A protein has these predicted regions:
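...captures the hydrophobic TM-helix bundle architecture rather than a specific catalytic motif
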Residues: 1-272
Length: 272
């Protein structure tokens, strides 16, 4: 009579084949695949960001001047909310680990509680990223872009603080036409018009003697170079368009690469 013998080797395999690779279970192996792929992906992002920042360090936007907002509060809070988001992300990771540990110890109520905290933390983080994107895209002060793609920002010479376009731009009786299929090239689309035209910014600048231009270049003190009144007027002669906020092509904060990395890294992180 034939008989079937079950060996310990057969019990140690998963999905056919020989013994478990490195003695790991299927779930643990897939978790390591996830961790390593994550590490490689973010390493690539951060290495590219670091290289680009080092390459253009003299004109790279200052993060403390870009991320200054906190929901429901008005004022200048450099990187405060970014630090809060980092704290929420770390704590949600901790609660997830605690939930897994509670599951191993068969503590159902603890698992439910820690998973609830993890979900709340994840919702806060993703919601914060959505708010951060909206604020970044909308912009704060506005700027003008030159023929060479450089960004010129504006400063109040009396106080040294940034000046928004709305603070000095003139209102001119000029007609502004947005490109549409019926009045242009049918396969070319155009975004919404900025609040002010280049001419309105120039005329307003001439009428306010206390407004000067701040360039992208960073001096030895780590601050953006502020031009004199005459130098500002000379620079503005090369202005081609008004930039409000940021996207993948134009960026009022400075280098467009800064905005590109912001969208790709934070976007991948949010979906991840």
């Amino acid at each position: 009579m034939d008989s079937t013998v079950t060996t310990g080797v057969e019990e140690s395999v998963w999905g056919g084949g020989d013994n478990r690779p490195l003695g790991a279970s299927y779930g643990k192996m897939m978790m390591w695949f996830f961790i390593l792929s994550d590490a490689l992906t973010f390493s690539g992002f951060l290495a590219a960001y670091g290289f680009s920042r080092f390459k253009f360090i003299e004109t790279w936007p200052i993060a403390d001047e870009v991320f200054t907002h906190v929901p429901f509060f008005h004022g200048n809070y450099p990187m405060y909310y970014v630090a809060f988001m980092t704290f929420v992300l770390i704590m949600s990771s901790v609660t997830m680990v605690l939930a897994v540990d509670a599951g191993h110890r068969m503590k159902k109520n603890s698992v439910i509680w820690y998973m609830f905290l993890t979900i709340i933390g994840g919702a806060i983080f993703v919601g914060s990223q959505a708010w951060e994107w909206a604020t970044f895209i909308q912009g704060d002060y506005g700027a003008v872009e030159t023929k060479g793609g450089r960004i010129l920002q504006f400063v109040n010479a009396d106080t040294g603080e940034r000046a928004a376009l709305a603070d000095f731009a003139a209102t001119l009786p000029e007609e502004r036409t947005i490109h549409e299929n019926k009045n242009g090239i049918w396969f070319y689309s155009e975004g919404s018009l900025p609040t002010y035209s280049v001419n309105e910014v120039l005329e307003g600048f001439k009428a306010h003697s206390n407004i000067v231009v701040r360039t992208e270049t960073i001096n030895e003190e780590g601050e953006k170079v502020v031009l004199s009144r005459q130098e500002s007027l000379a620079k503005l002669k090369n202005a081609t368009q008004v930039v409000e906020g940021a996207n993948l092509i134009h960026n009022e904060y400075g280098s467009r690469l800064f905005a590109d990395f912001f969208f790709f890294i934070t976007g991948f992180h949010g979906f991840h």
